[in-house]
């Protein structure tokens, strides 16, 4: 049986936030104050819809967005990690669950030739309309009260595991690699054999620290990382167990 690796994208695979990164395409590399102030908590996808409309209205073309997105730096050690996983696909299945969008993730993976490492990508579907505006739709609908309305990563992960079970695919354990607040929900549902891998110093790490101080039990083990090389070391340890 294989190990399932679940990756976040922004600030995990890449070392920045792809949505805020493309603001460099705007005039003076910033958004108008009224657009900045239009964000409402839990409605990030809707906010980005307004940002993409603004960029289109300002004459920013698809090629400019692509050039910006494909210049995003990978997180330290991540290229080595993805290369390691490519060489060990017989041991690992890899999926991405991200609140970015399908176009940005496709561009990054395609430019770095890492598409083949990932079995499935779950994210907000995106496309360019006839006017050249990038439109992003919600990933799904869900009933979770802890997550933004467009994406509950725990729901997505649970549905993926169920579908794999229906195909007769079982995993020895799940390793969840992420950084953000929306990674807390799926991580708290991991089981005893599983591993939560929060990026050091980021929201997920800080939240799990607080939970342990408040004696809120976590079933899974927690392994903090700051470089993909540390993740490789832990995966090598797991497959030798």
Swiss-Prot record:
Keyword Cytoplasm: no
Tree of life domain: Eukaryota
Organism: Rattus norvegicus (Rat)
EC number: 3.1.3.74
Positions bound to substrate: 19, 99
The protein's name: Pyridoxal phosphate phosphatase PHOSPHO2
Keywords: Hydrolase, Magnesium, Metal-binding, Pyridoxal phosphate
Similarity comment text for this entry: Belongs to the HAD-like hydrolase superfamily. PHOSPHO family.
């Amino acid at each position: 049986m294989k190990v399932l690796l679940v990756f976040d994208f922004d600030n995990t695979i890449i070392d920045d936030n792809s949505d805020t990164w493309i603001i460099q395409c705007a005039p003076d590399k910033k958004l108008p104050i009224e657009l900045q102030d239009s964000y409402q908590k839990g409605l990030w996808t809707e906010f980005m819809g307004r940002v993409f409309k603004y960029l289109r209205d300002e004459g920013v073309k698809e090629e400019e967005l692509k050039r910006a997105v494909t210049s995003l730096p990978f997180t330290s050690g991540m290229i080595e990690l993805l290369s390691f996983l490519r060489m060990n696909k017989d041991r690992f299945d890899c999926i991405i669950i991200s609140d970015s969008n399908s176009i940005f993730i496709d561009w990054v993976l395609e430019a770095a030739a890492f598409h083949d490492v990932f079995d499935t990508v779950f994210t907000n579907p995106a496309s360019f309309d006839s006017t050249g505006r990038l439109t992003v739709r919600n990933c799904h609908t869900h009933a979770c009260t802890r997550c933004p309305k467009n994406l509950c990563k725990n729901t997505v992960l649970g549905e993926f595991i169920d579908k794999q079970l229906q195909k007769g695919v079982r995993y020895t354990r799940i390793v969840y690699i992420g950084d953000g607040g929306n990674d807390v929900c799926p991580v708290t549902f991991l089981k005893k054999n599983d591993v939560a891998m929060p990026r050091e110093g980021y929201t997920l790490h800080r939240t799990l620290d607080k939970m342990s101080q408040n004696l809120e039990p976590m079933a899974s083990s927690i392994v903090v990382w700051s470089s993909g090389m540390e993740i490789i070391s832990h995966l090598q340890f797991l497959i030798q167990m």
